[in-house]
Amino acid sequence: MRIISGTFKGRKIERPKDSKTRPLKDLTKESIFNILTHSNKFKINLINSKVLDLFSGVGSFGIECLSRGAKKVIFVENYSNVLAILKKNLNNLKSNSDYKIIKQNIYDNFFFNNLEREFDLIFLDPPYKENKLEIIFRGIKDNEILSENGIIIMHRHKNEEEILIPGLEIIEKKIYGISKILFFSFLK
């Protein structure tokens, strides 16, 4: 795994040796950023954006955002073994980029209450077969975590069911191998 573009282009991102963690593949990540850059369905300018990386794992998505000029990235991960690799990956950047790491269970009742607001981009990469995603989307909406024109991107297995929540719209959907990438926004 590597950083694809921007300030840290070409740098490697370490990943865990076990197979329980499935970091975002470079090709899928590159496709996501191409859509973010060129889509006519929404406008996101990564430069100076504020990004929330939920289930961040080793930080591949959030680090790519920092490399491409994001103003701030908040990484949220709950598993200690993966968290150690995330910290190492960020330290290896030797950068004064603005980022924060939060070790917390996202399903904690107070997680979204205590989180910053107005994220331009929220990335979700939950474990496959995760069935509590409605809690996350409701937390984001009820606590106004996403900015008015913000986008939520979710990485899922291609065979997983769509998430249907009133007021949540799928803007774009792409399949890459076994991965499904969904782009969401809340209806205004």
PLM feature segments, named:
Residues M1-K188:
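Class I S-adenosyl-L-methionine-dependent methyltransferase catalytic core
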